[in-house]
């Protein structure tokens, strides 16, 4: 099966603007069984943020919490009009700013996710939009729609995985009242992924970094 690549400019940032209804969401089941070849469409979002940050000190000053953590679990959710997000449980390995302590579990939400084509289509309330989206995947039968998937991810971001370690610059997400989740400051700009022991690279520059990696000592508040 060919893999469709779609560039999507998502004007409504779910985690920042809260443009979603939690009661109308569905969770992707059996995510551990999803194979790479089952993902037939990748939608890459281009997000615009009001402010940029000059570096880790600027990010830290504007964050409610900064943690070095490890992903314990991953949950994919699709909301209204096909907007996906990922809810993570992250174990705090070291607290660099804020009220969290080593061993705490933090809920982190990201603007990315994987959903079945069926759930994606069903998430649209407008019948005309359902028909348009069904036509986009007309080469697949109704049965196949339940077993094939769409991936959504922000530009210059990476998909989260269990065991992944990173430094996260956090603030309360738009879903905090319902789910007590935090989100990264400016998406991938607010995350530094551990590429080797105590070596961290900004997530949005992974693979093309021009600066040497940071260490935990560089993040002392």
Residue spans for each PLM region:
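Bacterial N-terminal signal peptides that target proteins for export
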Residues: 1-7
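Netrin-like (NTR/C345C) domain of secreted extracellular proteins
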Residues: 20-37, 112-221
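C-terminal motif of bacterial Sec signal peptides marking the signal peptidase cleavage site
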Residues: 15-18
